[in-house]
Amino acid sequence: MQQDGTQQDRIKQSPAPLNGMSRRGFLGGAGTLALATASGLLLPGTAHAATTITTNQTGTDGMYYSFWTDGGGSVSMTLNGGGSYSTQWTNCGNFVAGKGWSTGDGNVRYNGYFNPVGNGYGCLYGWTSNPLVEYYIVDNWGSYRPTGTYKGTVSSDGGTYDIYQTTRYNAPSVEGTKTFQQYWSVRQSKVTSGSGTITTGNHFDAWARAGMNMGQFRYYMIMATEGYQSSGSSNITVSG
């Protein structure tokens, strides 16, 4: 990333995760990801309502879900069926958890709360291929608001978002270690109502106008809670 040494760098350059697998490598599932372990392969499973998980996994619980932690502090995700999930974290290292779609580019509705004490994002998060792009649409954040190379603004769903582009060099991704672009839409003011809509096409079109071309939507898209060296909680329900 271009902003070496900044807090933005640090949240994306987290300590080595469990079993030596990166967060991006773990989350690349598109519904078929397997987590390599010393004893074999942990395949995505089907969870049940009110199931609390603390180990890295993907699966379905009414909707696709993904949970990854680097093992720092105490982090859990509770799967409540349908599009609902909650998280609790205390003195975490880095984690990301969310529900959504194994492949996706559709509109998203959500409600609930995101309550970080320190650094974290409440965001729509996903990847495209060819070109490989990691993208964020950030509606809420904790002590740090992400930035990058400024590309303009887009108005959508009752708010104005600043558009940023950053680059990751030789970094872990859903396609292995590669250099790739990150695209960001970051709301100028946080969503405080507890509910929101993200019309993804508005952001994708604005990125294209700024010369930020997307690829194919072969990979997952989740409404995510991410924390970095912080504590907090969230309770989110996602729908299309």
Curated annotation (Swiss-Prot):
GO terms, biological process: xylan catabolic process
Post-translational modification, as annotated: Exported by the Tat system. The position of the signal peptide cleavage has been experimentally proven.
Transmembrane segments: none
GO cellular component terms, A-Z: extracellular region
Gene3D superfamilies linked to this entry: 2.60.120.180
UniProt-listed Enzyme Commission number(s): 3.2.1.8
Signal peptide range in chain numbering: 1-49
Enzyme class: hydrolase
Localisation per UniProt entry: Secreted
Keywords for this protein: Carbohydrate metabolism, Glycosidase, Hydrolase, Polysaccharide degradation, Secreted, Signal, Xylan degradation
Major site of localization recorded for this protein: secreted
Database matches in InterPro entries: ConA-like_dom_sf (IPR013320), GH11/12 (IPR013319), GH11_AS_1 (IPR018208), GH11_AS_2 (IPR033119), GH11_dom (IPR033123), Glyco_hydro_11 (IPR001137), TAT_signal (IPR006311), TAT_signal_bac_arc (IPR019546)
Lineage: superkingdom: Bacteria
Domain GH11: 51-239
UniProt family annotation: Belongs to the glycosyl hydrolase 11 (cellulase G) family.
NCBIfam families in UniProt: TAT_signal_seq (TIGR01409)
Protein name, entry field: Endo-1,4-beta-xylanase C
Lineage: Bacteria, Bacillati, Actinomycetota, Actinomycetes, Kitasatosporales
